[in-house]
Each structure stands twice: as structure tokens, then as C-alpha cells.
Amino acid sequence: MPILDPNVERYLKDLRPERSPAMAEMEAVAERDGVPIVHWETGRLLAAICRAMDPVVLEVGTAIGYSTLHMAEQLERGRVVTLERDADRAEQARGYFQRAGVADRVEIVEGDARETIAALEGPFDLLFVDATKTEYREYIELAEPKLRDRALLVVDNLLMGGDVAAPRGAETRWAEDSLASARVLNSELVGGGRWLGCVLAVGDGIGVATKV
């Protein structure tokens, strides 16, 4: 659900350039099959970060690889380690990476991220989280020791279509436990302590922070 004024949303969509064949196909498949992928603007932000940093990325939540492709296309020496629990979606993603010519920059690790993160070596320069919303804070806590000093954290869906601002008990599109998890994480990222960050009204709301 858009969190911006519809006129602004329409204007931003009109600015989008033509997508590569692989990316356009992924968008069509996601819409057809109901696969959750990031908004294009979110992918573009990740792409710009990867272009600037050329990081080693840890991504929690591959789905069919749409956000992964945005990042991998911009890497030279960097790479993406992406975690996905759904084997069928992981296989779909591999096919897209091969066709887009970025398979050598991406490693897909299958399984529950709460279990697979422990086996990763790191260190990572960028952590991107877009998976089960109620588990966001657990993913971050598990991955944090594997991040470099001053690593960047990016988290998707933190405004949840604006539902995080709805009064408790109001009818919303998101479950209350997901909303509660997002509210706590937003406070942690913005309020200081372990992270210096903010929540941006981009896509469905993106948290951007760095370790302090």
C-alpha cells in the first residue's frame, strides 16, 4: 500500500527508467504470483548504496531475487550472500541471476536465517533485511557480530503502508504482532543507543542506520 500522496506516487513512477529484461520479468512474475518484492525505489536506493560502497552484502530474504539483482548489478569486487528459506523461490532466483549475468556475485544460502546466519563468516559491510517481519530484530541481533564497524543496516517495510501509525486495535492490513515488532525496531533505529539511523518514507518505509 502506498504511503505517499497518490499524485506523488504517480510522479515517481513516471520517473522510473526502462528496466532490464530480467528485472521486468521479475516484476511481472511477482505481480502474477503474489510474491513480495521491494518497491522499485527501494531497489534503486540499494543499488546506489552498492555502487558507492561496493560492499560485501548480507541479505535476509531473497524471494525471487529482485532486491538482490538491484544490488548485484552494481558490484565490482563486492558480493551478496542472500538467505532464503523457500527452496523453490531460491531456485527461481538462481535462474534470474544466471540470465542477468550476476551469478558469480551472488551466493544463495537456503534455510531458516535464524539458523544459517551462525555459519556465515563475514565480515559484512551492508545488512539488508526483508523477511518475516516478527523476526526482524532476531535477524539483526544474530547478524550484528558479523558486521564491520560502521556497517550499514537497511530494513524494509518499517512503515507497513502507514499502519504503524494506526491506533492500537484499529483495523489494519498487517497483523498486530508485525506492527508491534516494527514499532519497537523503529524506536531502536531512530532513538539512539546501538544504532544511528532514521526511517524514510521510501517504498513501504525503509530504516537506514549504522552501528555506533
Ranges and model annotations:
Residues 1-126, 133-154, 158-212:
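A short alpha-helical cap/connector motif
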